[in-house]
């Protein structure tokens, strides 16, 4: 009796809360853990205690020559999680879902330059609004 009860219990990340092992495939909905292959293979039990056996694919189309020491488990040994135009990704994203996983470094530098210009422009603009804000505060004080 313990066996059927275990079979009925189904881990939420892999199988839905409905009956664990219906006549249909175990996981009709492809969860994020296994985007391409089914979550529970027909040969294996419907809901194994272990997580999805299928490893997440690595959509990073970058060769092994990419100078990226960080190789997360999501990417195979032949694939690095950084494009050719990038040095490396300091924070390896989850399975390199975004092909531009390293563009964050470049964007960070660009943002720094842009933010500097924005601050200069911003410092000039705020000089006008302060008067409006001051009047608003006075109105609130009167109330």
Curated annotation (Swiss-Prot):
Keyword set, alphabetical order: Cytoplasm, Fertilization, Membrane, Mitochondrion, Phosphoprotein
Keyword Mitochondrion: yes
Biased amino acid composition, Polar residues: 113-126, 134-143
Cellular compartments annotated: Cytoplasm; Mitochondrion membrane
Main subcellular localisation: cytoplasm
Residues with the Phosphoserine modification: 37, 44, 110, 128
Coiled coil segments of this chain: none
Bilayer disposition of the protein: Peripheral membrane protein
UniProt note on tissues of expression: Testis. Is selectively expressed in the spermatids of seminiferous tubules.
Disulfide feature: none
Annotated GO biological process: binding of sperm to zona pellucida; flagellated sperm motility; penetration of zona pellucida
Cellular component, GO, one term: mitochondrial outer membrane
Stretch list, region Disordered: 101-143
Tree of life domain: Eukaryota
Function: Involved in sperm motility. Its absence is associated with genetic background dependent male infertility. Infertility may be due to reduced sperm motility in the female reproductive tract and inability to penetrate the oocyte zona pellucida.
Name of this protein: Sperm mitochondrial-associated cysteine-rich protein
Organism: Mus musculus
């Amino acid at each position: 009796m313990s066996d059927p009860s275990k079979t009925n219990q189904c881990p939420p990340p892999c199988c839905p809360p409905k009956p664990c092992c219906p006549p249909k495939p175990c996981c009709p909905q492809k969860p994020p853990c296994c985007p391409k292959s089914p979550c529970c293979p027909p040969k294996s039990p419907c809901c194994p205690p272990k997580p999805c056996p299928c490893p997440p694919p690595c959509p990073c189309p970058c060769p092994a020559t990419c100078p990226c020491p960080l190789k997360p488990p999501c990417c195979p040994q032949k694939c690095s999680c950084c494009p050719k135009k990038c040095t490396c990704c300091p924070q390896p994203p989850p399975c390199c879902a975004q092909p531009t996983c390293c563009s964050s470094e470049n964007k960070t530098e660009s943002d720094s330059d842009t933010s500097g210009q924005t601050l200069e422009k911003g410092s000039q603009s705020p000089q006008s609004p302060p008067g409006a804000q001051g009047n608003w505060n006075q109105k609130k004080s009167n109330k």
